[in-house]
Amino acid sequence: MDEADFSEHTTYKQEDLPYDGDLSQIKIGNDYSFTSKKDGLEVLNQIIFIADDPQEKAMHSETCGNTAVTIPLGKITENAANKKDEKEKQCTAALHIPANEGDASKSSISDILLHHLSKEPFLRGQGIDCETLPEISNADSFEEEAIIKSIISCYNKNSWPKEQTPELTDQLNPKRDGENSNKPGSATTTEENTSDLEGPVAAGDSSHQENVNVLTKTKGPGDKQKSYQGQSPQKQQTEKANSGNTFKYGQGQVHYQLPDFSKIAPKVKIPKNKIINKPLAIAKQASFSSKSRDKPTLVQDSLETTPESNCVEKQHQEQKGKITEPSQQIQMEPIVHIHQELLTGIESEASLSKLSPTSQKGTSSSSSYIFQKISQGKQMCQKLKEQTDQLKTKVQEFSKRIKQDSPYHLQDKKLVLEKLQGHLELLEQNFLATKDKHLTLQQQVHKHESTIVGDFDPERKVEGEIFKLEMLLEDVKEKMDESKYTSAPSLPVSSPVTLDDLASTFSSLSNEIPKEHPGHPSGPRGSGGSEVTGTPQGGPQEAPNEELCELAPQTYLNGHYGDAAAQNKPDQVAMRLSSNSGEDPNGTPRRQDCAEMTAPSPSCAFCRRLLEWKQNVEKKGHGRINCGRFSIVLHEKAPHSDSTPNSDTGHSFCSDSGTEMQSNKCQDCGTKIPTSRRACRKEPTKEFHYRYNTPGQNYSNHSKRGAFVQPHSLDESKNSSPSFLKPKRICSQRVNSKSFKGEHEPTPGKKKLQAFMTYSSDPATPSPHFYSCRISGSKSLCDFDSTEEIKSEILNSALDHALRTATILKETTDQMIKTIAEDLAKAQRWRNRLKY
C-alpha cells in the first residue's frame, strides 16, 4: 500500500462530544495503559511478527486504542493508585493538578479510557493557548520545558507495549467504523484534553527499562527504515509541544474535578510603551524552543522505533498547520494591533505636524510682520541714540575749549554755540517725529490683531540723553557768559582810603573847574572851596582826573557817610563793582553817541572832558581809577554788541540846592543837562557790591535790590557841625545795588532800582567837600539800553525754553499714560487667551 492510502487508513476522525456527553463514547487511540510487564512483552512479540505487514501496521494504531477494554478492573484500580502516587512525586513542582484518579474504580471503563490519553492528542493538541495567552517568565518556560521533556520521554517509553494489541482489532473495528463515519469533528475535542498526560506517564515507569531493551533488540531493518521517515514529523510535533507557553491546564474540568482556568481573566499584558520588547520576547521564546530540539538520545531512539510515526505524519503536519496558525495569530495579533496603534499615533503626529504649519502659517506671517515692526522701532531708536551721542561729544569738546581757549574769541564761540543749539533743536524734532512714526506703526500692528508690539525707547534712554544734552548746552552758555563778563583782567582791590584823601583828590579836580559855566548860575561860595554849578570841570589832563572820568560810563560811586566820626576817622572802603559795557574785552572802540557827532569846542569843559575820556578808553580798554589810596576795580562784561546807541545824553547830573528841576544846555555842543536827582530812565544790568570796612562796624550789605539811599547832607547827621547846614554841592548819582553775600548773581527779569547818595561839604571845615562830578552819561546810557535789551532777550528765551520744556514733558507724560494703558490692555488680552 502506498503512503497516501496508508495515511488515509491511519487518519481517523472522532466524534465532537460535549464535555458532559455520553460516557459510552470512546476516545480512539487515546489509552495505552498496561500495568504488567508480561502484557507489554506479549504485545511486543506480536508486533514484531506483524511488523512486515504494512496493512497490519496500518491497523495496529486503530486497535491499540481499545486494548484497555480487556484489562481487568482490578488492575486498572491498582494502576490508578500507582499513578496517583508517582504523579504526586513527579509533577507537584510545576503541574498543579489534583489527581482524582482514585475514584476511577467507581466509574465505567469508558470514563477511565477517556481519563488516560495517549501521546497522539498530546502531540497534536494545542492546549489552552487558543483561549488565553498567559504571560510567563523565562524561568517558568525553562521549568516547563524540562518537565515536558521528562513527560515525553516517559510517555514514549511506556507507550510501546501498549501499541501492539492486534487481537483486539476485530472487537472494536465495527464500532470505530461507525464512529469514523458519524463523528468527523472529534479531533478538536481530543485536542482540547491535553491536561490528561500524566496518567500514562506515571503508569509506565515500572516497565520502562525492559521495554527499552526489548525495543532495541527487536528492531528490524524495515521498522528502522520507516521510523526514520517519521522522525522529522515527530520532532516537529515535539517542538510544538515544547515551544513556549502552549501547555496550561484547565480544560479537563468536565471529566476531572480540576479548577477551570478558562474562566479566569487572561493575564496577557502588552504595554504600549514597550512595543520593541515584545518581538524580542518572541525571539527569546523561539530560541528556547530551538533548544528543546536537543532531545535526549533515549527519546530520539524511542521516536525512531515508533511504528505509528508514518501513520500520523501527514495528520500531524495538518494538525501543526492548524495549531500554529491560531497561536501565531494570537501572538501576532496584539503586536500587529500595537503596531497599528503606533502607526496611527505616528500618522496622527504627522498630521498634527502638517496641520500645525498650515494653522500657524498666518500666525508666523503676522509674527514676522510684528518682528519687522519691532526691529524697525529698534533701528529708529538706535539712529536717534547715535545722533544724540555724536552731538553730545561735540558739546563736550566745545565745553572743554571754552575752559582752555582765551576769552577773546567769544564771537566764534557764540556762533558754534548757536550751531549746536540748532542741532539740538533738530534732534528734538526728529525724536518727536520718530516717536509719532512709531506710534503709527504700532497702530498698524494692532490692526493686524497682534498683541506683541515693540516699544520705542522703552527705558527712555534716548529721551534722557537728549535732555542731558540740552542741560549741557545751557551750562556751556552760562560759562560763555561768565567768561565774557570776566574777560577784563582783574586788578587788586584798593587799599583803605580816607575822606581827606578823597577831599584832596576832588579839590584838585575843583581847581580845574571854571568859576562859572555858561548857562549855569553860580551859588554862594565858602572859603577854601568853590561851588560847582553843574558839570565837572577840569583843566589840565591829570592822571587822577582822567581816571576818575573813566569811571563815569561804567560805574557810579555810592557811599554813605552819615557819622561825624567817620569824617575824623579814616574809612576803609573796599568796593567791587561790576558793570555792563558795550565794549568788547579786546579793547574795541565803543559805540558812538550823539556827543561824538557834535564837535565840542574847548570852551565847553564837559564836551572836552568827554572827548578826552573816549580817547583814553579806546587806548586802554579797561578802567582802573586811582584816587589817592581809593582804588576801584572795574570788571567789564560785554553781553552783546548789536545794541543801538542811545541819543540821549546827560543822564547823570549835578544840581544846586535851590535849583533841582532845572536843565541847561552847553552852548557849544548843545548837551542838555537836567538837574533832576532821579533822572536815569534806564536800568543798569550789571551789579556791584561793596563793603564798609569801618572800625567797629561789620560788613553791611544791601538787603534789597531796590534799596534807596535817600539824598541827605552831612548836616542831617547827629554829630554834624553848624557849618554843614549849608550844602555846597549835591551830587545825585544812579547806582545799581544788589544784595550779595560774598558773590554776585544776576537775576534777569527783575528791575533794578536806583540809589542816590548826596555829599555835602562846608568850605569852612576841614571835612572833605564832595563835588558833583558830572560825567557824561551818553556812553553809559547806550550800554544800559543794550544791556536792557539783552536782558529782555535772555528772559524771553528762558521763558520760551521753559514753555517748550513744559510742553515736551506734557507730551511725554501723555505718551507714557497711553503706553501704559496699551500695555495693560495687552496684558488683559493675554490673560483672557490663556484662560480660554
Curated annotation (Swiss-Prot):
The keyword Coiled coil applies. Residues 311-323 have a biased composition (Basic and acidic residues). Keywords: Coiled coil. It holds the Pfam family AKNA. Residues 159-172, 181-192, 227-248 have a biased composition (Polar residues). Residues 372-484 form a coiled coil. InterPro entries: AKNA_Centrosome-Trans_reg (IPR052655), AKNA_dom (IPR022150). Residues 159-248, 303-325, 510-545, 575-596 are annotated as: Disordered. Belongs to the AKNA family. This is Protein AKNAD1. It comes from Homo sapiens (Human). The lineage of its organism: Eukaryota, Metazoa, Chordata, Craniata, Vertebrata.
